[in-house]
Amino acid sequence: MTLVHSNFAEIDAILDSLGIPAVDGMLFDLGVSSPQLDDASRGFSYMADAPLDMRMDKDDALTAGEVVNTWPQGELRRILYDYGEERYAPQIAAAICRAREKAPVETTLELVDIIRSAMPAQALREKQHPAKRSFQAIRIAVNDELGAVSRMMQAAVGRLNPGGRLAVITFHSLEDRIVKSEMQQAARGCTCPPEFPVCVCGKKPLVKLVTRKPIVSGPAELEENPRARSAKLRVAEKL
C-alpha cells in the first residue's frame, strides 16, 4: 500500500508518479472527513469557536477568513446561493460586508452571529442550524470542491482497465449532480442531435452504469453512523 498526500483531482498525475497506467477499481469518498469536522480548530464547525480556516489541506493558501474578509459582496452572494443553496444569500453577503468594514471577521462564531443577524425570525426557528448552508458554501469555495470533483470524474474513467469500476460516494446534492452527469455522459456515447439519421460524431460509450439510482444507507448503517444519512453511492464500469 502506498499513501499519497494529494487532491483526488490530481489522479492522473498521482498514477503517473507511481508508474501505474491503469487500475481495476477506484473508490472516492468525497467531502469533509469526520476527524476534520470533529477537530474544532480546523474551522469547519458552526458549533464551536475557532479561526476561520476550513482548508481540507493545510498546505493550501486560501482560507475561509480570506473569503469572508476580502471577496466582493457579489461573489459572496454567488457562492452562498450556488454552493449553499441559501435563499437569504443577498442579506447574508451584505451583513458580512457591513461587519468586516468595522473589523475583520476572525472566528467561526463571529460569522455565525453575522449570519443570524441577517436572517428573518422565522428562518431562525427552523430545525436546521441557520449557518449550515453558509458554512457549506464557504467551505466548498475554499477547497474548490466542485471543480475538484469535475476534474476527478473526467480523469478517472480514462485510468480504468476494461471491466474496472469507478465508485463515488457523495454527501450533498451538488456533488451528486456532477457525479451523476459525468457518469451519464460517459455512458451515453453518441452526442449527435436526435434528428440525425446516423451517428456522425463517432463517440462510443466509455462505461456502463452499474447503479441507475444511487445506493443509500440502510437503517443499520444510519444507526451506527448517522452522518451517512446523506451519503449516495454511484458506480460505473469501464467498457
What does each of the following model-derived ranges do?
Residues 1-239:
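S-adenosyl-L-methionine-dependent methyltransferase catalytic core, i.e., the SAM/SAH-binding region
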